[in-house]
Amino acid sequence: MNRNIFITLLISLLALSGCSGDTCIDPDDFGFIKFNISSRYDPSEVTSRQEGDQVAPWRDSAYKVNGYPLTIMVRPWDYMSGDKNTSGMLSAWCPWYGQQNNFTTLAEFCVRLRPCQFTDGKMCPTPTPRDAPINNAPCILTNGVGLYFLIADKGSNPNMSPDSQRSPKGITQHLGEPVASQDYEFYSISSTGKFLQAGGINYQYGCTSLPCDQASNYAQSSLYFKILDKFYDDNSGQYRVVIKSGVSDTRPDPLQFLTNLIKNELFGTSDKDPGIVRQTYQQIIETPGYRLSVSALLTLYIMFTGFSFLIGNINMTHVELVVRILKVSVVSILLSTSKAWTFFHDYLFVFFVEGLAQILQIVQDASTGQSLLSLLISPQTLSKLFSLLFVDPLGFIYIILYLIALYFIFLLIFKATIIYLTALITIGMIITMAPIFICFMLFNITRSLFENWLRQLISYAIQPIILFVGIAFIGMIIKTEIQSTLGFAVCKKDFPDLGPINQIFGSFTEDLDSSIGNSIFYWWFPVPMKGGIENFTQADILVPEDYTKKDGTKCLAYQCIDKRYIQLPFLDLVKDANRISNFINGKFVQLDGLLLIFVSIYLLSKFNDTAISTASFIAGTSGNLTSIQAVNQQSYDSIMKQVNRPINYATGVISKPINRMQEQTSMFFAEKYQGLMMSRLENKALSSSANKAVQNEVKRKYGIDHKDVNMQAGADYKNGISKLLDNKTFLPKGGDLDVKKLATMNFGQLRDEFAKNKYGAKNYSSLTSDQKLELDKFMKSDLGEKGKSAKSLRELASDANFTRDYQSAYKYAHKEMSGRGVGLFGKNIGVLRSWQEMENRMKTKRELKEQKRVAIGEKIYAGYTGLKRDALTAIVGKDLRDKYEGNLTSAEWHDFDYNDPQLRTYSESLKDKERAREVKELQMQINKETLAVQEDILSPEYLARLKRPSDVEYYQELGQRRLIHEVRDRLSEGSDPVIMGDRFMQEKATDDQMRTMIDNAHQKHAEFIDQDRYTRRQEHYDIMHEKAQENIDRTYKEIKDHFKRDDIKLEEMPALIAQYEREKPIESFDSKTELSLDKRIEEAVSNFNINAKNYEYSASVLNNIEERKQAITDEVNTQIDRINKYRENAKMPQYQKPVENSGRKLRKLEDHLRNMK
């Protein structure tokens, strides 16, 4: 039992160990905003009026200032002290020798240069020259020299034009000016654990105290940065910027996201998105019965007022008259549907919704800094926490107590959020009922109902205010204590120190993450870790917490200066002398501070419990009825659940077989109906009533134009087969064959069937050469009357196959359009179809966005459990890991899913889902390009017609990516997939299973080639190419023999053909033709040009088809090689050769003619 607890705690420590991305963390860093500012720009971003006078845009930090002291620090960097030239460490730049890849690194020449020095120590002396007076160039600039920030005026854009980039509107300050003149200094810990002086600025808007008018005017203004130079093309390097205070934290907060989501759903975001509350409110006041009731109440009220005045029942003073007129006016507004919501929202409801949000924002701003929860769980805080484990005997106890406190704080904050959301929803419900209760204010007998309604509204509005004021107050106590206790610097150290083994991992870990160090094993340790006053340094620094001076002046964080230890900036030298003494003596654990945290947690829990009753007391309502009703309802639901359990069980047992039978019956008729509808669609595709929109979709998605389809091809093919079967010389046993069945086969299948019937062979390939010649003689002979309409069986089969492909494409295009929401009217009305298509694209984008959002959470959790699993394996070994896995590491993420034919783990399924989303995004891109050109951009025909090589490469790249996914999907489908889960292949797959996978890969490769909609067209273009080649060869031979030349070029052929027709003997002409010489020349030249065009076009298409077949083959071989790699790792022999594609590369016409010499 004790061992289980120890392993659980140890794995928790490994899993929660913070990864901040830095080698060392500053003492006051509990989650600062950090980013890099590069000294280089893309050439397209830089403009120049003349050579050497470039201007670059300002970089938007994506943060807005909040009017409090803006404290920005630039990290120091010293190569000679051990800092590395990597994007994670570099904080310097060089104005010389930079290359295009030096956005985040220094040029090699600049790495070892010394920092720049300026004449008289001033970078910008007065009067300011054009160039900084550097006296040791070339050199590197550090500590913020050359870096400026800009607080832009509200509504202005500093990057609107080159002039605005040079002279932006707002506040600009240089971060590289020496801060010694300001009576304070910035210090930061380097990657080697040394405290170095850093650059930076503490800007307080020129105010003696904050807040002030100028600070308020610039609150929520955008913050920009830029390294100022006059020539950026040879710059290299970057600055690492740390924003310590003065900006609104826009980093994601899950609880804030949840509250905003519900609030926007209830109250909307704009007039176009009104929200549930406003919609319900509008529906109530727009109801005719309600308007009639309000009119009747107003009429009665006016009548009673007049009657009471006449009989002297009321004393109509000026005040009473004004009150009654106001009541009538307010209730009368409810009759105006267009103004009712605007009036009551702007003058009443806004105080309970927007006013509540503003008050909560004021409370949060008053607490300053980051939220309590983000501070407690930030990587920097956790890194400092876990650094106590090996430096103090009480470190382990402190960590456990801290985690327990964190758990309770999270529960309390979550509970407070639920209370706030409940209050928000209740306020929405109360506002929804406003049209009813506002009418109750007219009469004395119903006035109490209106007053109670208003009290409830006030009560639920006060609840969150009281709650979050308490959280902010107690949260400040906890934050102050955490900062004081963990306010020291930490650095990563190799732990355990493996000596020479660390060198093995050094280069690998540096490429992976420069912050890891020389080993994949590390831990955080405090700096300085050893006690002694000599390791601590005092200096005048900005106090990083809210602070009260000796004279009673209140200061915000980073507003005032005080002398403190730079290693312990949160501790006052006098007030916190005992804690400072403990740190100097090497005692880092402060248990008294932890006691204060637990006391604060207890107070916070009590405050949560009393917030609702306090708000109810203030508003004058008890608030007990809702709680009693909730308890009664929960008790009732629990009892009824127990009573109904046996009844529900008996009902389920009886209804299960009935439901199964109904489902099977419904499925049977549904399949029959679907088959009937699909058959009707295929027949409709060949009729004159075919839908034009679907035909255009077929052309756009499948590359088949209905104008190229012979609608009678199927009948012609069937007639050709019948005619051939009637020839008893050809097929003595032809009567045994079914013509209808043969008409569904392609030419290759039909030839195999004839070979089997005539010779008794297995297929055509097994015939002898003489038998093949005899069979080909009959099958390739023209079956029609001599002339243009006469075609061989091969041509008829090709046309019929093309027509069947068109029918299938029409059917699937119709189905896809229906799936995208394009209904019957949309298929016939262009405007409606465009609208429905746009809605489908928007829906698809939303679904992909939602899937990505869900996948991010799943991926984070999968990675988290994977980290725990790896940690457990490293500690206890694989065998013991399997024993503890079920309870400790969420094994379901890593176990096989036996319902999955691929036997993947859940984490592997997540990766495949991510690939599926990538396929959807890729398909959306392909659809967009297809829609633009109104053709199938992936078809070999379209690629053959393209003229620009860049377009061909772009579309081929899209097609290649799509084809890889198609092949992988084909290899993953079925009950015996080729692609299995990685863990199964590594640990469980047997020799027989892997052999079966490779055999299936060969089989699926053949099926894919045969069924692919593009490769199926090869026969059609083979025929076109052979006919064109045959005609060209015959013409070329005639010209060659006539002119006795062997060097005829393609461009000479039209002229030589014309000359040949003029010189041709009269005896060679057909007596039946009476064409003139000019007509004969025109026809001969035209025929040659058509044949040449068909030759080139068919050759290009066939080459594209061969490339597609080769790509399919390569991807299948990749998966076979993957399986053989697993076999090799398992010490199994390699099995079966890769799939081969006996492809060909057709020559261009010029090369073909040259080869005929």
From Swiss-Prot:
This is Uncharacterized lipoprotein RBE_1261. Residues 1148-1157 have a biased composition (Basic and acidic residues). Residues 1-18 form the signal peptide. A lipid is attached at residue 19 (N-palmitoyl cysteine). Belongs to the TrbL/VirB6 family. It is found in: Cell membrane. Residues 1134-1157 are annotated as: Disordered. The chain crosses the membrane at residues 292-312, 394-414, 423-443, 458-478. GO terms for cellular component: plasma membrane. A lipid is attached at residue 19 (S-diacylglycerol cysteine). Keywords: Cell membrane, Lipoprotein, Membrane, Palmitate, Signal, Transmembrane, Transmembrane helix. The keyword Membrane applies. The keyword Cytoplasm does not apply. It is a multi-pass membrane protein; Lipid-anchor. One of its GO terms (biological process) is protein secretion by the type IV secretion system.
